[in-house]
Amino acid sequence: MYKRQDDKRRDETEDNEYRHSRGRNDRRGRRMRVRDRDYDERDERRGRGDRNDRNDRNDRADRMDRNADRDQRNDRMDRADRDQHRDEPKEDLVPVAGIVDVLDSYAFVRTSGYLPGPNDVYVSMGQVKKYGLRKGDAVHGSIRAPREGERRNQRQKFVPLQSIDSINGMSVEEAQHRPQFSKLTPLYPQERLKQETTPNKLTGRLIDIVAPIGKGQRGLIVSPPKAGKTITLQNIANAIATNNPEVHLMVVLVDERPEEVTDMERTVQGEVISSTFDRPASDHTTVAELAIERAKRLVELGQDVVVLLDSMTRLARAYNIAAPASGRILSGGVDAQALYPPKKFFGAARNIENGGSLTIISSALVETGSKMDEVIFEEFKGTGNMELRLSRELADKRLFPAIDVNASGTRREELITDPQELPIIYRLRRLLGGLEPEQAYQTLVPRLKKTATNRDFMASLIQQSGNATNGN
């Protein structure tokens, strides 16, 4: 038994000695390998200087060969691309025209009017900045024609604009140097828009006497319901088209009846822009904003533009519905923030110092029984420089044109009135000032009917005044 234990201890001792010796040999081998690697690196550093020249020459030769191979491959690819493009049919482009509507992060070319439509063309903000496009610009460009078998709305809702040929009738380079509307100098109206056309058109003749209109006028037609404001606007539009054909006439109808829109389109020789009452309030505001921006772009080119708006009250109502609530509510339920966009619209009217003018004549509703309409009118009451008031009493008695002579007038009318006629008009004003609206109407209108023109009417007043003086 003791002998077996001694043998076991001896075997364990021999195993331990073998493991220790093997570990020493492994460590010794690793040290030798590291030393050999260090020797090799040292030898390489010593001999590198001799090999650098040969390696550099070889590297340059290799690079030249690789560049030559790459050039040959590129030439072959270019020839293949040219052959492919020559064989392929060229992409067809379709001309397109419309009004630019710039939104927050993109823009559209409205091709079917001033409202959004399915055929509108998408314009990126990069193109807007590149070409200097502004809201209201009239552009002519081109889009890609749909390929054979490709449906319009197959991949994208709106077709992108490919190129622009002209902006407002000018080249793209010329459009870059046009002035900005906000930097133009406004003045009082100095050139008259004559309203007199024929002897039987008493509305225009009466307006020329009591409330003359000039280029750059900012006027309000204050009217109760059923007093003839729409007919008055039609007469003003037709008179401007007849006497001043150089003026660009725009009639903006907001929240109106469809039949009135049709009647206006058939009777007015101008651009009629409308949004009927069956459309949402956002469409009313969109039409008004794009129309006034279009007018500004024309004024920047030195043109005379007249905008007839029917009505400012309905436009303010639409903004009150469509604009986000500010939390500040005026009497009648009018949001204070909703009145700023209509004021911006109305305030754009001005006579430009070095040519061009923007005239805005808008109607405003009163005596409707709505507190909101009263608040809206009071906000715009002092902003205009011309006011034409229509009388409910005269309209109820079917006395048309139902113009309240004493309540109507124009600021600085001496700038647009003939100096020879001005003293006569002042004398007539003093004569009619003490009369009631109906008496003033019955005094003035029958005498107008007896004469063919306002000049004859003025001459008759002078003659009558001279006879009265001689008689005394």
Regions found by a protein language model. Give the residues of each.
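Acidic low-complexity intrinsically disordered regions
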Residues: K3-Y106, R110-P118, K129, R134-K135, ...
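Short alpha-helix capping/helix-loop boundary micro-motifs
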Residues: V121-K129, R205-L206
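P-loop NTP-binding catalytic core
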Residues: L133, A145-I221
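Conserved glycine(s) of the Walker
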Residues: G228
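Hydrophobic positions on the alpha1 helix immediately C-terminal to the Walker A/P-loop
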Residues: T232, I236
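P-loop NTPase catalytic core
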Residues: A237-A239, L249-N472
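Conserved SF1/SF2 helicase motif Ia
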Residues: N243-V247
